[in-house]
Amino acid sequence: NGPKLFQLYIHKDKGLTDNLIERCKKSGFNSMCLTVDAVVAGNRERDHRTGFSTPPRLTLSSLLSFALHPRWSLNYLFRKKFELSNIIHTTDKGSKIDQSVMNYMNEQFETKMNWSDAEYCVKKWGGPFALKGVMSVEDAKKAIDIGCTAIIISNHGGRQLDGSRAPFDQLSEIVDAVGDKIEVILDGGVRRGTH
């Protein structure tokens, strides 16, 4: 019964983006957040160390892990087919191998989005709208210009944008510049960082 916010990623298939926005309206979501701080895949060091991949690759190490964990292995082989509800109508319906969904997401996430894309989503939504990934005063001002009602200062936990400044370091200058014109939220998630 509480407020609901939908975190949106722009897709190359604009019909899918439109469909998600319309479904959120019909489902009673109160606000929308467009994520712009994850245009590159995260540096998942643990996955590199363990050899994790999607779909799983059969290596000597993974075969040993499957053999040592028979319950997990059987669950993987005989579980309900994986579905990503938001896009199930656009992928191979319930493929046992997660590759169809992963390939779709890799092909469909828009890495070249621009301010026109963001403004389109703000207008299409027509309600409270946050832009997540703002890291400069200039971008905060532009978010106001396109109609956002909130910004989220974020670098996606440092995993995607590890070389950027920390959101906390951006907070005071952004709040000083636009804090009286737009709601400013600081993303508190920090997974890692080198700076």
Annotate each predicted stretch with a short phrase.
Residues 18-21, 135-147, 176-180, 184-186, ...:
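Catalytic cores of alpha/beta
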Residues 2-5, 27, 60-61, 111-129, ...:
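Alpha-helix-loop-beta-strand connector modules within alpha/beta enzyme cores
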Residues 1-17:
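A gly/proline- and charged-residue-enriched helix-loop-helix capping module
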Residues 17-20, 43-49:
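Short acidic, glycine/serine/threonine-rich loops at helix termini
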Residues 36-42, 148-164, 192:
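Glycine-rich phosphate-binding active-site loops on the catalytic face of alpha/beta enzymes
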Residues 4-8, 32, 129-132, 152-153, ...:
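Hydrophobic faces of well-ordered beta-strands that scaffold small-molecule active sites
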